A protein has these predicted regions:
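Hydrophobic/aromatic beta-strand elements that line small-molecule binding cavities or substrate pockets
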Residues: 5-7, 66-74, 86, 99-107
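Short strand-connecting beta-turns/loops that link adjacent beta-strands
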Residues: 12, 76, 108-111
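Hydrophobic pocket/interface hotspot
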Residues: 15-20, 26, 105, 115-117, ...
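Glycine-rich portal/gate segments that line the openings of hydrophobic small-molecule binding cavities
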Residues: 38-90
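Beta-strand/loop substructures that line and gate deep hydrophobic ligand-binding cavities in soluble
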Residues: 81-135
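Intrinsic-disorder/low-complexity, polar/charged segments enriched in Ser/Thr/Lys/Arg/Asp/Glu/Gln
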Residues: 1-8, 52, 66, 98-100, ...
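Hydrophobic ligand-binding cavity/cleft-lining segments
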Residues: 1-48
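Short, highly charged C-terminal tails/helix-capping segments
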Residues: 34, 38, 146-152
Length: 152
C-alpha cells in the first residue's frame, strides 16, 4: 500500500534539502501527533549519513514503539532524493512486513521547490494501518509547508 504527497514548498531546494536532514524539522512536522525521543538521549543536529538513529515514539502521548531513521542521499539531475532505510522496530507498525520511505525535492522555475514523499508498506496489517498512515502523512506535509515558509 502506498501513501504519497506531492506538494510545493515556499522555499528553495537548498532549504528544503536541509529540512529533510534536520531532526528538529522532523519533530516539528510530526508534532503533536508523534513524539520521537532518541534512545541514546541526544538529538543530532543533522541526521548522520547512512547511520541508523533509534527513536522511541509516542503517538498522541501513548508509547508506540521504536523506529529508526537511516538516511541515504541520491541525486538524479536536479532532483535530490532521500531514502530512509530505517523504519519500525517494535510496536504496532512493526506488524508491517515492509516499509520503504523516500522523499525528493526539485527546484521550480519560480524559486520554490516541489516536495514528494512516498511511503510503501505491505503485510497483512497494512490495510488496517493505511488510514492512520495517510492521515499522519497529510499532517506531516502541512507542517512541512508551514516550516518551509519560515525564515531559515
Amino acid at each position: 500500500m502506498r501513501v504519497v504527497l506531492d506538494l510545493v514548498l515556499d522555499c528553495d531546494v537548498e532549504r528544503a534539502w536541509a529540512l529533510l536532514h534536520s531532526p528538529a524539522a522532523m519533530r516539528f512536522a510530526m508534532a503533536p501527533v508523534l513524539a520521537p525521543t532518541p534512545v541514546d538521549g541526544a538529538w543530532p543536529s543533522t541526521w548522520p549519513a547512512a547511520t541508523a538513529v533509534a527513536l522511541d515514539t509516542r503517538m498522541l502521548g501513548v508509547p508506540s514503539g521504536r523506529m529508526t531513521v537511516e538516511l541515504h542521499d541520491e541525486v538524479r539531475g536536479d532532483v535530490r532524493i532521500v531514502h530512509d532505510r530505517g523504519g519500525p522496530q517494535s510496536g504496532p507498525l512493526d506488524a508491517l512486513s515492509s516499509w520503504r520511505h523516500r522523499m525528493a525535492v526539485s527546484p521550480l522555475p519560480d524559486g520554490r521547490c516541489r516536495f514528494r514523499d512516498r511511503l510503501d508498506v505491505s503485510g497483512a496489517a497494512a490495510p488496517a494501518m493505511w488510514p492512520t498512515l495517510w492521515a499522519l502523512w497529510q499532517w506531516r506535509g502541512h507542517r512541512l509547508q508551514v516550516l518551509a515558509r519560515r525564515e531559515g
